[in-house]
Amino acid sequence: MTDNALRETIIRLAQPVVHTLGLVIWGVETARAGRTIVRLFVDVPTIPQRPGMPEGSEEPSSAITAPAPAHDPQESSGAEAPAAPTSATIEQCEEISRHLALALEVEDSIADAYVLEVSTPGLSRLFFSLEQMIPYVGDVVEARLHTPVASTDPAAHGGPRRVWRGTLVAVEDDAFVLAPVTVSPEGEVEDENQPPVRLPWEAVRRATRMYIFKKPQKPGKKPGKPQGKEVPKGGSGSTAPKKAAAKKKAGRTAAEND
C-alpha cells in the first residue's frame, strides 16, 4: 500500500470516532524507518478566517464543524457555560487509538509491523494544507522544500535555499509568502532585511509553525555591587595595619641611620 493510500485509509477508519468526540482530523503523517509509523493528529474544530475578513461573517460551506451539542436546560437558567476546549485530551486520543487499532486489525490494512501514534498537532504544528495556515498569519514558519528555491525579487541577496524560515505574511490559493527571519538558539527573532519570498505549495516537502521559546536570562550580579570586602567608615579597615607597619618600619630605618 502506498503512503497516500495508507493516509486515506487512516482518515476513513478514524473519521467516525473522531467526529463522535466532537473533534476533527488535522492530518496524517507516515514514515518508514524499519517499520511503518503512522501519526494521526486530531484537534478541536476551528473556522479558518482569511486576513481582512470581517468578524461575524458567515461561515464558509467547506468549513468542518463539530456536531451540534444537545440543549442544556441550564443555559436558559442563566448558568455560566463551560469554556470551550482548546485541544483534544489525552483520554480522547487514547480512545481514538483503540478504535483505530481495532479497525486496522480487522481490515488488515498494514501487513508489516507498525506503530500507531494519536496526538494533537501541538504548538509547533505541521501544516497539511494552505487553508490550515490562514489562522497563523504573523507567526514564524519553517518550510522545507523538495528543491532549493530562490527569491524572485531582484533586490534579494543570497542564493536558493532548501529551507526557508520567515514570518508568514500571506496565504494565496497555491502558495504562501514568508518574510525571511533568523532565529537564534536563545529564541531571538531578527529580520533578515530581505524581500518576502513566495513558496509554491507543490514545492513544499514539510511546513511547520515554529514555536519560539526564549531562554530565560541567567541571574547575574546586581549592577553597581562593590567587589571584595567593604571598608568600614572612619578609616579603620584592612589597610590600617599596613599603614601602621609602614610607619614602624620607617622609624626603625631612621634609628639605624642615626
Curated annotation (Swiss-Prot):
It comes from the Bacteria. Belongs to the RimP family. Residues 48-88, 212-258 are annotated as: Disordered. It comes from Desulfovibrio desulfuricans (strain ATCC 27774 / DSM 6949 / MB). Gene3D superfamilies: RimP-like superfamily, N-terminal (3.30.300.70). It is found in: Cytoplasm. Keywords: Cytoplasm, Ribosome biogenesis. GO terms for biological process: ribosomal small subunit assembly; translation. Residues 215-224 have a biased composition (Basic residues). Disulfide bonds: none annotated. This is Ribosome maturation factor RimP. The keyword Cytoplasm applies. One of its GO terms (cellular component) is cytosol. Required for maturation of 30S ribosomal subunits. HAMAP family: RimP (MF_01077).
